Amino acid sequence: MIGAIRGFSLEHYVTLFTTKELLHMIGGTLLLAVTVAFLSTLLGTIGAIGSFYAGKKSGQCINFLNQIPIANAEVVTGFSICVLMIVLFGVDKDTYLPLLVGQTVLCAPFAYLSVLPKLKQMDPNLYEAALDLGCNHRQALWRVIVREIMPGITSGFMLSVTLSLDDYFITTYTKPAVFDTISTYVVNATKGARTEIKTALWALSAVIFLVVVLVVIGMNMKAGRRQKR
């Protein structure tokens, strides 16, 4: 019975982890989030490095283009990608490509903004110094630049995962009919779903909250240890 407190029970958690429909939805959502985060972080990092080492006008142009998806409402972005991919390019909506592209367009600018400050904090002479010490361009990039900005890359990846999990509007416009993420499933489940499914989703919310708290605590502890060193 919803709304009546009758003591502590793990019944809803059992329902959550034993219902195949919910497990399939959660697994698909996590796989999508990790894939989108990887692509977004890769594109955001490449864009940030290119913007940092490009000329002033080129850097300003990249920064301006990066602001467009952020300033746009998600509904506009989702509908635009739906029209672009499906109507103009003829991509089948039953594939995952429109969804993958849509969420990457949403997340990549935030990954870019996470990496760029780390580049600005870095000594601008490190790259040239690495070249002078015998590194080629690829070695200087991977062994010096990427290591220096790794905290920003990690932050961009985690932020992209969060944005992908949270997104509803872009997912609604671009997802295949047979696929649901946590956000779209929860919205649909509030419209006449069985009581046990609704309560299992409450349990899922508690699990997500606990995982986020543990991740934040772990990252803060790791950062504190680095500062002590």
Model regions: which residues?
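Periplasmic/extracellular loop-to-transmembrane helix junction in inner-membrane transport proteins
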Residues: M1-A37, K191-E196
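Transmembrane alpha-helices
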Residues: Y112-V115, M122-P124, H137-D166
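Membrane-interfacial helix termini and adjacent extracytoplasmic/periplasmic loops
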Residues: I2-G3, L10, V75-C107, R138, ...
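Interhelical loop and adjacent transmembrane-helix boundary motif
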Residues: Y13-E21, L165-Q227
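Hydrophobic alpha-helical transmembrane segments of multipass integral membrane proteins
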Residues: L23, G27, L31-L43, G47, ...
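C-terminal transmembrane helix and the adjacent membrane-cytosol boundary/short C-terminal tail
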Residues: G55-S58, L116-Y127, L131, H137-V144, ...
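Membrane-helix interface segments
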Residues: Y53-I62, V91-Y96, H137, P151-G152, ...
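Transmembrane-helix boundary motif in ABC transporter permease subunits
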Residues: V34-N66, F79, V83-V87, L141, ...
